[in-house]
Amino acid sequence: VIHHETFSFYAFMTQPTSIANEPTQRLTAFSAIAIIVGIVIGAGIFKTPSMVAGVTGDAGWLLVAWFLGGLISLAGALCYAELATTYPHAGGDYHFLARAFGKDISFLYAWAKATVINTGSIALLAFVFGDYMTKAINLGPYSSAIWAIGVVVALTLINLIGISASSWVQTLLTIIEVTGLILVAIAGFYISGDAPASPAFFSSTPSLGMFGLAMVFVLLTYGGWNEAAYISAEVRGGRRAIVPVILMSILILTLIYLLVNIALLAGLGLEGLSKSSAVAADLMGKAFGPWGERTLGIFVAVAALTSINATMIVGARTNYALGKDWPALRFMGHWEGGRGSPIRGYLVQSAICLALVIFGIFQTDGFGVMVEFTA
């Protein structure tokens, strides 16, 4: 009997518990919103408004497109809220596909996420960060790549500390990013009196094909809210909390995008907006001079940082889910309970990202190569 009890106690002490080695509810609702908003609001909002304005050719339809983008995203978010509350899992889309179509199909999706989609997105955003930081501090002929490598390593190290550190950094970066967009909106309303002319609303109607093209740009800018599924098992409050988190994120995104576009119309006019290649920079420069343009560069760099960190958080969880289900990738299926993070998933992700950045060094345009790689 003594031998049996000793063996049982030894087995208990040496076998990791399910709590220690699986995701637990450590994320606050605010942190979860910061992750979702941080993924969605990237550099796109600084570029796509001019493209949408040029395609629609009307201020009214421009705003309709952005509002409709919010409604479509909301509809999708409601579907994901149902999935995330019914099947909360670190695998997110991978887990949903596995339940619907089997693990073979879901493996292809998760493998693409792990090796191309997430890692390629991180690499291209790292080059965006590097390009903007090089304007402030040039580190030589490979400055952009050096900055890109540095940011991948730095954010990976922060995430290795644990979910508390990474979520705190994510919240801070998202606040700075949103503040920057609010500053852009203020600049637009500040110079609205100097705008060429008040844009006419619904004076012309774009063709169905052109409006559809505008919606492509809009939905591209809204893209990423579905990543909420990857953190659904880690939000405090469980199933009751994830629905408000997703809905609040979409509401915040829609309000910010509408506010920014209204401000751009007020400050630049429809024609100025449609012809601008850097709408936010032009607006900030017009409102505050060279100082405004330099400040915007900092906010764009922060936007890239925000998206990189958020993508790292959800991407590592894809690696973890793969490791849990596939014996050949078992080394990635370890969850560090004390840190609340898939440490090995982060390390694999970082290695692939760094390899992509280093590959980009030897290309004419590292950013362009990463765009083609992820397309």
Where would I find each of the regions flagged by the language model?
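Transmembrane alpha-helical segments of multi-pass small-molecule transport proteins
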Residues: 65-68, 136-163, 178-185, 346-355
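TM-loop-TM module centered on a large, flexible mid-protein loop between adjacent transmembrane helices
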Residues: 95-96, 102, 134-139, 245-312, ...
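Helix-loop-helix junctions that connect adjacent transmembrane segments
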Residues: 18-23, 63, 137-143, 171-298
